[in-house]
C-alpha cells in the first residue's frame, strides 16, 4: 500500500471515529436534557406555580379590559347628552374610578370578602385576611375594584344633566364603601345567598343557591336600581316634557362617539364575563372561557338586532340610539348566566332584553 493510500485510510478512520463519538455524546446530552426537563416539568410545585401564574395573568388581563370600559361609559354618556354637560359627565367618570379605587381598597374589600353572613368585617388597609386560593390577593383586589367602579359609573349616566358634582361624590362614596360590597358579600363573598348548607334560607326556600357568574345583579342591577331611584327623585331633564305634558326626545349631541363608546364597552365585556372564570391554565378553563365569549357575543348581537327591528316597525325607521342600547341590554342580560346557558339560550336572552329595553323606555317616559 503506497503512502497516499495509507494517508487516505487514516483520514477515513479518524472521520468515522469522530462521527461515532459525536453521535454518542449528542445522544447522552439529549437524554440528560430530556430527563432534566421532564423532571422539572413533572414537579408538582413547578406545575402549581405555572398554573397560578397563567391564572393571574388572565385575571389581570381581564381587569385591564374591564377598566377600558370606563372610557366606553364616558363616551356613551357624553354622546347621548347635550354638549354643555360633556365636561361634567367626563369628570364624574374619572371620579368614579379614582374615589372608588381608594375607598374599595380602604374598606370595601373587607366588607365584601370578610367573615360574616350579612356583611363582612372591615379590614382597613389590611388584605392579609383574604385567601385567594392561589391567586394573589392584590391582583384579585384590582379585579374587584374595576367591577365596583363599573357599578358606580352606571349611576352617572342615568342622572346626567341634573346632578350637582358634589352630590354625585356622595353617591360614589356610598356605592364603593357600602352598597356594592354588601351586595357582593351576599353572593361572591360567600354570604347568605350562596349558603348551600342544609337548613339555610336559600336551600329551604328555593332548593338552590343564587347564581350570578359575572354580575348581572351584583354589578349592573345594583347600579341600575340606584340609578332608577336617583332619576325618580331628581325628576326629568329640563326640556324633556312640553307644556302639554308629552314626552319629547332629547337627541344626543354626538352619536358618533356614543357608537364608539358602545363598541368599547362590547370589547370590554369580553374581559368582564370571560374574566370571571378567574382561571385559564387548563383545557376545561379554556373551554369555559370560549363558551362565555360565544354566549356574550351572541346575546349582544341578538339584543341589538331585535332592538333595531322593533324600532323600525314602531317608528318607521331604524333607531341608532335604541340599537346601541339594545346591544348593551343584551350584554347586561347574559352576564349572570353566560357560563351556563347554551348559545341558543344566549340568543333568546339577548332578544328578550333588546325588545324589553324599547318598551321600558316608553314606560318610564
Annotated model-derived regions:
Residues 2-365:
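Hydrophobic alpha-helical transmembrane bundles of multi-pass membrane proteins
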Amino acid at each position: 500500500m503506497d503512502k497516499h493510500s495509507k494517508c487516505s485510510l487514516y483520514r477515513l478512520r479518524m472521520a468515522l471515529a469522530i462521527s461515532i463519538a459525536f453521535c454518542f455524546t449528542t445522544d447522552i446530552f439529549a437524554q440528560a436534557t430530556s430527563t432534566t426537563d421532564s423532571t422539572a416539568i413533572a414537579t408538582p410545585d413547578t406545575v402549581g406555580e405555572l398554573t397560578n401564574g397563567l391564572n393571574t395573568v388572565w385575571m389581570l388581563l381581564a381587569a385591564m379590559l374591564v377598566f377600558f370600559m370606563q372610557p366606553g361609559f364616558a363616551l356613551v354618556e357624553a354622546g347621548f347628552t347635550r354638549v354643555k354637560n360633556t365636561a361634567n359627565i367626563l369628570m364624574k367618570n374619572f371620579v368614579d374610578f379614582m374615589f372608588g379605587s381608594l375607598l374599595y381598597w380602604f374598606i370595601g374589600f373587607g366588607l365584601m370578602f370578610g367573615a360574616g353572613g350579612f356583611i363582612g368585617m372591615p379590614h382597613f388597609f389590611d388584605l392579609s385576611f383574604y385567601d385567594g386560593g392561589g391567586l394573589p390577593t392584590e391582583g384579585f383586589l384590582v379585579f374587584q375594584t374595576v367591577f365596583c367602579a363599573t357599578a358606580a359609573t352606571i349611576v352617572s349616566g342615568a342622572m346626567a344633566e341634573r346632578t350637582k358634582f358634589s352630590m354625585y361624590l356622595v353617591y360614589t362614596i356610598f356605592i364603593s364603601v357600602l352598597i356594592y360590597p354588601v351586595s357582593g358579600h351576599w353572593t361572591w363573598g360567600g354570604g347568605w345567598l350562596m349558603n348551600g348548607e342544609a337548613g339555610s334560607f336559600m336551600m329551604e326556600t328555593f332548593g338552590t343557591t343564587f347564581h350570578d357568574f359575572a354580575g348581572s345583579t351584583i354589578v349592573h342591577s345594583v347600579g341600575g336600581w340606584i340609578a332608577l331611584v336617583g332619576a325618580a327623585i331628581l325628576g326629568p331633564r329640563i326640556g324633556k316634557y312640553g307644556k302639554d305634558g308629552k314626552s319629547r326626545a332629547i337627541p344626543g349631541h354626538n352619536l358618533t362617539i356614543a357608537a364608539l363608546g358602545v363598541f368599547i364597552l362590547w370589547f370590554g365585556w369580553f374581559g368582564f364575563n370571560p374574566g370571571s372564570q378567574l382561571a385559564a391554565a387548563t383545557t376545561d378553563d379554556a373551554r369555559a372561557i370560549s363558551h362565555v365569549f360565544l354566549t356574550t357575543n351572541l346575546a349582544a348581537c341578538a339584543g341589538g338586532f331585535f332592538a333595531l327591528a322593533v324600532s323600525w316597525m314602531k317608528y318607521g325607521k331604524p333607531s341608532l340610539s335604541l340599537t346601541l342600547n339594545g346591544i348593551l341590554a343584551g350584554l347586561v342580560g347574559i352576564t349572570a348566566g353566560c357560563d351556563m346557558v347554551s348559545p341558543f339560550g344566549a340568543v333568546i336572552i339577548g332578544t328578550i332584553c333588546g325588545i324589553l329595553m324599547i318598551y321600558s323606555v316608553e314606560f318610564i317616559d
